[in-house]
Regions:
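N-terminal secretory signal peptides that target proteins for export/translocation
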Residues: 1-15
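A structural boundary/capping signal
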Residues: 2, 33-231
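Bacterial N-terminal signal peptides
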Residues: 18-31
Length: 231
């Protein structure tokens, strides 16, 4: 499933339930790492905008980053997945932002103390970049998640690839443990992306250059820079 290529026509068909603008919302530029983040600024903004509880969470986030830099990759994945899954609540954009689809920065996500699957995935992605994991080993993956026997819903997870053609390990806000994709038969990959490109299904060949498009993702990056996280 995770290595099966899909056609461009199939991609368009799968995207219809998620909204016409969602593909553009994914294709933007992101640097290969988060360079020299100013987490002092991020922490100050958390206190100013959201209060002491948010600032305390940023302090804990910074501690996680500092203490995890030298760990093996598997431990980094587990600690980052656990940190956000335990500290942040899942809630819809309609409730949090009064919008149908809003992609939050890590600061906004921490500040509100809640977010949806995109927000969890983005925060984990950014954190793992800061921990030194290469962008070529990370992809945000849009999937159809099966609920029950027949119903599927749009969902996003983060995938870690030990090697570009390997089976990914999946970080999911709905699952406490990091599991290989082969153990997530409830997820059907539609496409995945990072700064280097866009992949359809579980394919290994990029179909697009994300640096050529504008999107919500670009807006997230702009807001991240203003908040002390410089891509």
């Amino acid at each position: 499933m995770w290595n099966a290529a899909m056609t461009r026509q199939g991609l368009r068909a799968c995207l219809v339930p998620w909204g016409r603008g969602c593909l553009l919302a994914l294709l933007v530029a992101l640097g290969a790492s988060v360079a020299a983040p100013d987490l002092d600024k991020t922490q100050a903004l958390a206190l100013q905008r959201y209060g002491s509880r948010a600032a305390e969470t940023v302090v804990a986030w910074r501690r996680l980053i500092e203490e995890s830099r030298a760990l093996p990759d598997a431990d980094k994945l587990d600690k980052v997945n656990t940190f956000f899954n335990r500290r942040i609540l899942f809630e819809s954009d309609a409730v949090i932002w009064q919008q149908e689809d809003y992609w939050a920065t890590p600061l906004e996500f921490i500040g509100r103390g809640a977010g949806d699957c995109e927000d969890f995935s983005i925060a984990k992605y950014v954190t793992l970049l800061m921990l030194g994991i290469g962008n070529d080993r990370l992809r945000l993956i849009y999937v159809r998640a099966r609920i029950g026997s027949t119903t599927t819903v749009a969902h996003m997870v983060l995938g870690f690839y030990p090697q570009p053609t390997d089976e990914p390990l999946i970080l999911d806000n709905l699952i406490s443990s990091v599991r290989p994709a082969s153990m997530r038969s409830d997820l059907a990959p539609v496409f995945s992306f990072n700064s280097a490109g866009l992949w359809v299904g579980g394919g290994t060949s990029s179909l697009a250059d994300p640096t050529t498009r504008l999107s919500r993702w670009r807006d997230v990056l702009d807001r991240m820079r203003q908040e002390g996280l410089s891509p």
